[in-house]
C-alpha cells in the first residue's frame, strides 16, 4: 500500500490526463480515498493488489498499483472498464487518483479457479452450473467483441479472471489489465500459457479469436474439473511448445457431440476456423435447455468421510444426474481411444469394456471429479470405478431425439453431423507418422510434424487430439528466436524461449528496438535470465512438493507409531484381563467343588 501511495503523484497525473482527454468518454466517478475503509487483501490481478473494502455502506474491491511499472496496466483497465456495462462483466464504481486505485464490484464467491481447484472443502456443482458459467462467459466476451466504435479483446481469459456472485450462479469477467482495442496487427504477448492461443505466443498477428481459444479451454476445464495441461508439468514454456505442436486437452468420454464439436473448433490451429463468440452464445443458449438447475446456489459439504478427504470434493450433480440409473452401463460401450500405432479411433477390447461397465455400474451415480492438481495418468485406476469426467450420454440422447443427427461411424469421428444445431466444418484428426515419446514428463506430445496424433496408452478413458495444420508452416515471431533455434532434443531450456510471458508484469522484458543491436542484445539477455528464473522457480516448487511429501510420510510414520503403541497397550490390557478372568475362573471352580462336596455330604447323612 505504501508503494502505491508513493507512486500516486506521478500516476495520478497520468491518469488525470487520460481522464481529461476529450477523445475519450469515461463513465466512472472520481472517488475520495478517505471514503474507503480497507478491510483485507484478497488477491492479485494483472497488476496491483486487490483488497476488500467498504465504500458507502457496501462491499467493494479496490485494486491498487504497487510500482510505477504498473501504471500503464492501471490506465488500460480504467479505460476499458469505463467503456463497458454488462451483467457478466465486473462493474467499475470509480477510481481514486491519490493514491491510484480502482473501486470495483466485489465478488463474494471468489474466482471460478478457486471453486474448481481451491482449498477444501470444495463446493459441489452440477453440469448445469458448468454450462451456465461458460454461457455467461461467452456472453460477456461477445459483448466486448461487438462494442462500437472499437471492439475489445480481453486476451487473458482464464478461471482466475472469472468471478462468481449470487451463490456461484452468476459469472463476471474481470482483470482488464491486458485488454486492448481490436486492431489488424496485434503482437503483444499477453495471457497465461495453459489458456493462451498458439498464435499469441508464436508472435504472429492475432485477433479476437484468441479469446475463443481460451474459452474452449475453460469449457474443458469446468466439465472435467481438472487443470489444463497439468500433466505436462515444469515451466510454462513446455505447455507453449506442446500447444505449438498441436497438443490439446484430452477429449472427454461420453461428451455429447455438439459440445465436443464446439470445444474442438475453438481449439483449431487456424483462428479463422474457430467460431465467433456470437455463434458460441447461440449454440450454448440452445444447449442450456438440456441443463436445468443452473440457478441453484452452490452447496458446500459440511463434513467429509474418510473417502471424501482422500479424494477431495466431488460434484453432487453431473451430467449423469439427468440420466437414468443404468446410463453408466450403456455409455461405457461407446468409449474410444487413439491407438499409439495409428490415427484411427478404435473401440477398446471387449473384456476391458465389460470390466469397466461392471465396476462403474457398481459405483452408482458418478460426478465431476475434484481437482487435485494431477495429470490424466494420476487418475484412480479403473478398478475404483472413477471416471475422468462427467457422463453425458443421456444428454446426448436427448439432443439426438430433438435434432436427429446421424450416428457417428467408427474410425474418424464425424464432428459436423449434428443436424441443425451446428453447421460447422468437419474437424479432421490427422496423422500419418508414428508418434514418439518426448522427454517432457507425463505427456505424449506430437512428433516432429504438428499434424501427428498424440496418444496416451495408459489412459484408456481419454484420447489426446491434435489439430491439423501445414507441416511446413513456421510462425512469425517478434523476436529473433524460432523453434528451429533449439538444439536440445529433450524439450528443455532452449525449446521455446517464451518463459517471460508467464512472469509478473513488472518482471517481463520491455519490447526491444529492432534497429538497435544493443537493444536486441539486452532483450535477449533479459529473456535468458527470465528462463533461468523460471527454471529456479520450478526447482523450488519441486523441492517444496518433495518437502510436503516427506512431511506427509513423517506424519504417517508418527500415526503408525501411535497406532503401534496403542495396540501394544491394548494387548497388554487384554492380557491382564485374561489373567484376571483366569484367576476368577479358578476361584469360582474351587467354590463350586466345595459346594458340591457339601451337598454330597448332606445327601449321605440324610
Swiss-Prot record:
Listed EC numbers: 2.7.11.25
GO CC terms, sorted: ATAC complex; cytosol; plasma membrane
Recorded family membership: Belongs to the protein kinase superfamily. STE Ser/Thr protein kinase family. MAP kinase kinase kinase subfamily.
Regulation: Activated by pro-inflammatory cytokines and in response to physical and chemical stresses, including osmotic stress, oxidative stress, arsenic and ultraviolet light irradiation. Activated by 'Lys-63'-linked polyubiquitination and by autophosphorylation. Association with TAB1/MAP3K7IP1 and TAB2/MAP3K7IP2 promotes activation through autophosphorylation, whereas PPM1B/PP2CB, PP2A and PPP6C dephosphorylation leads to inactivation. Ceramides are also able to activate MAP3K7/TAK1.
Function: Serine/threonine kinase which acts as an essential component of the MAP kinase signal transduction pathway. Plays an important role in the cascades of cellular responses evoked by changes in the environment. Mediates signal transduction of TRAF6, various cytokines including interleukin-1 (IL-1), transforming growth factor-beta (TGFB), TGFB-related factors like BMP2 and BMP4, toll-like receptors (TLR), tumor necrosis factor receptor CD40 and B-cell receptor (BCR).
Annotated source species: Pongo abelii (Sumatran orangutan)
Protein name from the UniProt record: Mitogen-activated protein kinase kinase kinase 7
Pfam families given in the database record: PK_Tyr_Ser-Thr
Top enzyme class: transferase
Catalytic reaction(s) noted: L-seryl-[protein] + ATP = O-phospho-L-seryl-[protein] + ADP + H(+); L-threonyl-[protein] + ATP = O-phospho-L-threonyl-[protein] + ADP + H(+)
Record: active site: 156
Chain segments carrying region Disordered: 301-338, 354-391, 443-493
Comp. bias regions, Polar residues: 306-338, 443-452, 464-473
A single MF term (Gene Ontology): magnesium ion binding
Location of region: Interaction with MAPK8IP1: 1-300
Cysteine disulfide links: none
Location(s), subcellular: Cytoplasm; Cell membrane
Keywords: Apoptosis, ATP-binding, Cell membrane, Cytoplasm, Isopeptide bond, Kinase, Magnesium, Membrane, Metal-binding, Nucleotide-binding, Phosphoprotein, Serine/threonine-protein kinase, Stress response, Transcription, Transcription regulation, Transferase, Ubl conjugation
Comp. bias intervals (Low complexity): 361-375, 453-463
PTM field: Association with TAB1/MAP3K7IP1 promotes autophosphorylation at Ser-192 and subsequent activation. Association with TAB2/MAP3K7IP2, itself associated with free unanchored Lys-63 polyubiquitin chain, promotes autophosphorylation and subsequent activation of MAP3K7. Dephosphorylation at Ser-192 by PPM1B/PP2CB and at Thr-187 by PP2A and PPP6C leads to inactivation.
Lineage: Eukaryota, Metazoa, Chordata, Craniata, Vertebrata
Membrane topology: Peripheral membrane protein
Names of the cofactor(s): Mg(2+)
PTM-bearing positions, type Phosphoserine: 192, 367, 389, 439, 455
Subunit record text: Can form homodimer. Binds both upstream activators and downstream substrates in multimolecular complexes. Interacts with TAB1/MAP3K7IP1, TAB2/MAP3K7IP2 and TAB3/MAP3K7IP3. Identified in the TRIKA2 complex composed of MAP3K7/TAK1, TAB1/MAP3K7IP1 and TAB2/MAP3K7IP2. Interacts with PPM1L and PPM1B/PP2CB. Interaction with PP2A and PPP6C leads to its repressed activity. Interacts with TRAF6 and TAB1/MAP3K7IP1; during IL-1 signaling. Interacts with TAOK1 and TAOK2; interaction with TAOK2 interferes with MAP3K7 interaction with IKKA, thus preventing NF-kappa-B activation.
Amino acid at each position: 500500500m505504501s508503494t502505491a501511495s508513493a507512486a500516486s503523484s506521478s500516476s495520478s497525473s497520468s491518469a488525470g490526463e487520460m481522464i481529461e482527454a476529450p477523445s475519450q468518454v469515461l463513465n466512472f466517478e472520481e472517488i475520495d480515498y478517505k471514503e474507503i475503509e480497507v478491510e483485507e487483501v484478497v488477491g492479485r490481478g494483472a497488476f496491483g493488489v486487490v483488497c476488500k473494502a467498504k465504500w458507502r455502506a457496501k462491499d467493494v474491491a479496490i485494486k491498487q498499483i504497487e510500482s510505477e511499472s504498473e501504471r500503464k496496466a492501471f490506465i488500460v483497465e480504467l479505460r476499458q472498464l469505463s467503456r463497458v456495462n454488462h451483467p457478466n462483466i465486473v462493474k467499475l464504481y470509480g477510481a481514486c487518483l491519490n493514491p491510484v486505485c480502482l473501486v470495483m464490484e466485489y465478488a463474494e464467491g471468489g474466482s471460478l479457479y478457486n471453486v474448481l481447484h481451491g482449498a477444501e472443502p470444495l463446493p459441489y456443482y452440477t453440469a448445469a452450473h458448468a454450462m451456465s458459467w461458460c454461457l455467461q462467459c461467452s456472453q460477456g466476451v461477445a459483448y466486448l467483441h461487438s462494442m462500437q466504435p472499437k471492439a475489445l479483446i480481453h486476451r487473458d481469459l482464464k478461471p482466475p479472471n472469472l468471478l462468481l456472485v449470487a451463490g456461484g450462479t452468476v459469472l463476471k469477467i474481470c482483470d482488464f489489465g491486458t485488454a486492448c482495442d481490436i486492431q489488424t496487427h496485434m503482437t503483444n504477448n499477453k495471457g497465461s500459457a495453459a489458456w493462451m492461443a498458439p498464435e499469441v505466443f508464436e508472435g504472429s498477428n492475432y485477433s479476437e479469436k484468441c479469446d475463443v481459444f481460451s474459452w474452449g479451454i475453460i469449457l474443458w476445464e469446468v466439465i472435467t474439473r481438472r487443470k489444463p495441461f497439468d500433466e505436462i508439468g515444469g515451466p510454462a514454456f513446455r505447455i507453449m511448445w506442446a500447444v505449438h505442436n498441436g497438443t490439446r486437452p484430452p477429449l472427454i468420454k461420453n461428451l455429447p457431440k455438439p459440445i465436443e464439436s464446439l470445444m474442438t473448433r475453438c481449439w483449431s490451429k487456424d483462428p479463422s476456423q474457430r467460431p465467433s463468440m456470437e455463434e458460441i452464445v447461440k449454440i450454448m443458449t440452445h444447449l442450456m435447455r438440456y441443463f436445468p438447475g443452473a440457478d441453484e446456489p452452490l452447496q458446500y459439504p459440511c463434513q467429509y468421510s474418510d473417502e471424501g478427504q482422500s479424494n477431495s470434493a466431488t460434484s453432487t450433480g453431473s451430467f449423469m444426474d439427468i440420466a437414468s440409473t443404468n446410463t453408466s452401463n450403456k455409455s461405457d460401450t461407446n468409449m474410444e481411444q487413439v491407438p499409439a500405432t495409428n490415427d484411427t479411433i478404435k473401440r477398446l477390447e471387449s473384456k476391458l469394456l465389460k470390466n469397466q461397465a461392471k465396476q462403474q455400474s457398481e459405483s452408482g451415480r458418478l460426478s465431476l471429479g475434484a481437482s487435485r492438481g494431477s495429470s490424466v495418468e494420476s487418475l484412480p485406476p479403473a478398478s475404483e470405478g472413477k471416471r475422468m469426467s462427467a457422463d453425458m450420454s443421456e444428454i446426448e440422447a436427448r439432443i439426438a431425439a430433438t435434432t436427429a443427427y446421424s450416428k457417428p461411424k467408427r474410425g474418424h469421428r464425424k464432428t459436423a453431423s449434428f443436424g441443425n444445431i451446428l453447421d460447422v466444418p468437419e474437424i479432421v484428426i490427422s496423422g500419418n507418422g508414428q508418434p514418439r515419446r518426448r522427454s517432457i514428463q507425463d505427456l505424449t506430445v506430437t512428433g516432429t510434424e504438428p499434424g501427428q496424433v498424440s496418444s496416451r496408452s495408459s489412459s484408456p478413458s481419454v484420447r489426446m487430439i491434435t489439430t491439423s495444420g501445414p507441416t511446413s508452416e513456421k510462425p512469425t515471431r517478434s523476436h529473433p528466436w524460432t523453434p528451429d533455434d533449439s538444439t536440445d532434443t529433450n524439450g528443455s531450456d532452449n525449446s521455446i524461449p517464451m518463459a517471460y510471458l508467464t512472469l509478473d508484469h513488472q518482471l517481463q522484458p520491455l519490447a526491444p528496438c529492432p534497429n538497435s543491436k544493443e537493444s536486441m542484445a539486452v532483450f535477449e539477455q533479459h529473456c535468458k535470465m527470465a528462463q533461468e528464473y523460471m527454471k529456479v522457480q520450478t526447482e523450488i516448487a519441486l523441492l517444496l512438493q518433495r518437502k510436503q511429501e516427506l512431511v506427509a510420510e513423517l506424519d504417517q510414520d508418527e500415526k503408525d507409531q501411535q497406532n503401534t503403541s496403542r495396540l501394544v497397550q491394548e494387548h497388554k490390557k487384554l492380557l491382564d484381563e485374561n489373567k484376571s478372568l483366569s484367576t476368577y475362573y479358578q476361584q469360582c471352580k474351587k467354590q463350586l467343588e466345595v459346594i458340591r462336596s457339601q451337598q454330597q455330604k448332606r445327601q449321605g447323612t440324610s
